[in-house]
């Protein structure tokens, strides 16, 4: 008789525009991860689908969820609230299903501090350069230069939290970045060897923040 295993949790965080949402969708499709759908008080972006990409709610609804202690994690990002409700995540993990989170460093810290009895692997995604990040943000649905400038300021602060993650991956090529994350997840699950150069990452962060 086989012993049922609990699912694992994988967190992907990154500065805005570094590509984590695309990577989360790839991992969900190719590695059978359930994407944890966050609640948010911001308005939908172009091509975002309610109840698939996010649960779009007003501030009162969000505050009620906080009051009722329904969030596994929540944070304020760019003047909007984001949060992950506990029950859907725990239900999936207990059934042996894996869950992947697209959240920022604040949410990642909260989940780590909860010390849940499930395996957790955390990744921080970096752009290859500040110039490429600026280009990505400018080409997205952000025609307002002030918004792009705000994102770049936040980047300088957010990137400092890389040290709190298990792995930091540079997204200079989407397929290669996905492959690295996928291999590291497999190695973590199977207790295999992990090809990861932390000194190289440290030097890259120093270059990004100089």
UniProtKB/Swiss-Prot annotation:
SUPFAM superfamilies named in the record: P-loop containing nucleoside triphosphate hydrolases (SSF52540)
Please write the reaction equations for the catalytic activity of this protein: GMP + ATP = GDP + ADP
Q: Localized where?
A: Cytoplasm
Q: Give the Gene Ontology MF terms in alphabetical order.
A: ATP binding; guanylate kinase activity
Which SMART domains does the protein's record reference? GuKc (SM00072)
Question: What positions does the domain Guanylate kinase-like occupy?
Answer: 7-186
Q: Give EC number(s), comma-separated.
A: 2.7.4.8
Record keyword Nucleotide-binding present: yes
Provide this UniProt record's keywords sorted from A to Z: ATP-binding, Cytoplasm, Kinase, Nucleotide-binding, Transferase
Q: Which residues form a coiled coil?
A: none
* EC top class, as a word: transferase
Q: Which GO terms describe its cellular component?
A: cytosol
Binding of ATP: at which residues? 14-21
List, alphabetically, the Gene3D superfamilies matched.
Guanylate Kinase phosphate binding domain, P-loop containing nucleotide triphosphate hydrolases
Protein task? Essential for recycling GMP and indirectly, cGMP.
Instruction: Tell me which family the UniProt entry assigns to this protein.
Output: Belongs to the guanylate kinase family.
Q: What is this protein called?
A: Guanylate kinase
**Protein source organism:** Pelagibacter ubique (strain HTCC1062)
**Taxonomic path:** Bacteria, Pseudomonadati, Pseudomonadota, Alphaproteobacteria, Candidatus Pelagibacterales
Gene behind the chain? gmk
């Amino acid at each position: 008789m086989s012993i049922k295993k609990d699912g694992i949790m994988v967190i992907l965080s990154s500065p805005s525009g570094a590509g984590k949402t695309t990577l989360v969708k790839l991992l969900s499709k190719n590695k059978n991860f359930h994407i944890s759908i966050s609640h948010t008080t911001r308005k939908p972006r172009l091509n975002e689908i309610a109840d698939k990409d996010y649960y779009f709610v007003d501030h009162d609804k969000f505050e009620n969820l906080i009051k009722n202690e329904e969030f596994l994690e929540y944070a304020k990002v760019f003047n909007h609230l984001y949060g992950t409700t506990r029950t859907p995540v725990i239900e999936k993990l207990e059934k042996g299903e894996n869950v992947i989170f697209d959240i920022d460093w604040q949410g990642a810290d909260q989940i780590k501090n909860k010390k849940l009895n499930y395996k957790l692997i955390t990744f921080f995604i970096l752009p290859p350069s500040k110039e490429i990040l600026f280009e990505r943000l400018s080409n997205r649905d952000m025609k307002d230069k002030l918004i792009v400038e705000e994102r770049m300021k936040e980047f300088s602060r957010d990137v400092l939290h890389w040290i709190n993650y298990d792995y930091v991956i540079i997204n200079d090529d989407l397929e290669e970045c996905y492959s690295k994350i996928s291999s590291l997840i497999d190695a973590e699950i199977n207790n295999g060897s992990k090809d990861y150069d932390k000194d190289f990452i440290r030097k890259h962060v120093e270059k990004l923040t100089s």
